[in-house]
């Protein structure tokens, strides 16, 4: 191998090529690579942020669902209590109404019983007068003996 001037010339051309590449070609390539790396890093950061937002949204949804379930349970329990109170109120009103009806029936029965007793007393008094009249064979004046007949009614 002969070392001659072409080898030196080729070395100089190669050095110029390296310098030209380092000065004009390499910076846009590194800039493009850096931009691409930044885009990838931004995308990964956005993905992580979206993932954390999704996680927090899921937690909020779960909290809302739990709150909704609690409210629904409370409303159902409240409705059940209201239903029970309405039923109890209806029962008490029905019992009260039945007691009123029974009391009215007792009062009416007592009045009818008293009326029947009075009618019977009058009939017994009339029968007693007729019986006494027949026994004595003498007419008895009812107006004269009203006091006697009144006592007789009370005794009966």
Curated annotation (Swiss-Prot):
Entry keyword set: ATP synthesis, Cell inner membrane, Cell membrane, CF(0), Hydrogen ion transport, Ion transport, Membrane, Transmembrane, Transmembrane helix, Transport
Primary location group: membrane
Disulfide feature: none
One GO cellular component term: plasma membrane
Keyword Transferase: no
Assembly and interaction partners: F-type ATPases have 2 components, F(1) - the catalytic core - and F(0) - the membrane proton channel. F(1) has five subunits: alpha(3), beta(3), gamma(1), delta(1), epsilon(1). F(0) has three main subunits: a(1), b(2) and c(10-14). The alpha and beta chains form an alternating ring which encloses part of the gamma chain. F(1) is attached to F(0) by a central stalk formed by the gamma and epsilon chains, while a peripheral stalk is formed by the delta and b chains.
Protein family membership: Belongs to the ATPase B chain family.
Name of this protein: ATP synthase subunit b 1
Gene name linked to the record: atpF1
